[in-house]
């Protein structure tokens, strides 16, 4: 669990270095509201710039007044225009809390959520939903709420929303944090959104290029060639690179056994181990598997 806040122009000028020093890890910033880019939050740019400079992870939210799914799409486009060119480590949230929207019922609320979030998703954003527990329970279908990262508001000592897993809980609107004059909304975060977003290539981030994984056989050959060190160092290197050490070492042992058998088989062909029962006895006494060696000898002889 990590600590976060959400801010808008209502908080005025924020000293994010003091906010960061107080133990806050992330901030969700209001980007704007409504269907026009002219409705951008007056403090959005300075909040974004200063929060980033202080080393905070940042998300954004867009307050909705949408009265139709089409209107929600317009809001999404306005939101994307405002936030374009920026990187966010937390989702871009659709803020659903207008009474006029809830008055239109669950089907309506579902439609505007899907319209807004769907438009953002089409354009490479991880879109989420902000809503209170009461309205989530009564005006949003579980299958819709479950599709998006949830930011749940409930000012209580615990969050009672249980229909779906939520990533953030807004637990108070009367918090006090160094660097902010007056009250501020307080949040607990439960999901590692920065990793999800960066690895997924969302919210302005490019998806990292992952090196092609080598097969166990390829790795085993490299181990035999001495490219992965020995003992614990080998185990550590293979594990750190994301490989299964036990599987690789098993294949190494198989390859070494095969190489050993090949060497002995060539010596047998050269007459160094005698013939018939004498050969069998010598190989067995030396600790070799006579049947495996002889099978390899037979195969090599056929190939000549």
Question: What are these model-derived regions, one by one?
Answer:
Residues 1-117, 121-124:
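Substrate-binding cleft of extracellular glycoside hydrolase catalytic domains
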Residues 1-11, 17-18, 141-212:
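Functionally critical loop-and-helix segments that line ligand-binding/catalytic clefts
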Residues 15, 40-47, 72-75, 79, ...:
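Stable alpha-helical elements in mature extracytoplasmic
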Residues 222-235, 269-280, 288-290:
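Extracytoplasmic Gram-positive cell-surface binding/anchoring modules and repeats
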Residues 58, 126-128, 150, 290:
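Hydrophobic anchor at the start of a short beta-strand
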Residues 208-228, 257-273, 299-304:
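Disulfide-bonded cysteine-rich modules in secreted/extracellular proteins
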């Amino acid at each position: 669990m990590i600590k976060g806040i959400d801010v808008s122009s209502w908080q005025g000028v924020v000293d994010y270095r003091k906010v960061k020093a107080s133990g806050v890890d992330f901030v969700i910033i209001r980007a704007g509201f409504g269907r026009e880019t002219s409705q951008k939050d007056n403090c959005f740019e300075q909040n974004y710039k200063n929060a980033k400079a202080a080393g905070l992870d940042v998300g954004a939210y867009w307050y909705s007044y949408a009265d139709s799914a089409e209107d929600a799409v317009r809001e999404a486009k306005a939101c994307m225009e405002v936030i374009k060119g920026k990187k966010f480590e937390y989702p871009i949230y659709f803020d659903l809390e207008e009474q006029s929207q809830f008055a239109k019922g669950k089907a309506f609320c579902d439609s505007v959520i899907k319209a807004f979030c769907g438009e953002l998703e089409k354009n490479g954003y991880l879109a989420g939903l902000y809503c209170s527990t009461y309205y989530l329970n009564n005006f949003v279908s579980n299958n819709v709420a479950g599709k998006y990262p949830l930011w749940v508001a409930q000012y209580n000592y615990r969050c009672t929303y249980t229909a779906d897993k939520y990533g953030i809980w807004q637990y108070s609107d009367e918090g006090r944090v160094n660097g902010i004059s007056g009250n501020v909304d307080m949040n607990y975060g439960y999901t590692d959104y920065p990793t999800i977003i960066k690895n997924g290539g969302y919210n302005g981030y490019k998806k990292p290029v992952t090196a092609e994984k080598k097969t166990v056989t390829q790795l085993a050959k490299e181990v035999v060639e001495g490219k992965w060190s020995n003992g614990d160092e080998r185990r550590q290197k293979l594990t750190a690179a994301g490989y299964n050490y036990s599987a690789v070492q098993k294949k190494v042992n198989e390859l070494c056994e095969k190489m050993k058998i090949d060497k002995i088989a060539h010596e047998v062909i050269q007459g160094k181990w005698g013939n018939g029962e004498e050969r069998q006895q010598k190989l067995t006494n030396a600790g070799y598997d006579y049947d495996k060696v002889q099978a390899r000898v037979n195969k090599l002889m056929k190939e000549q």
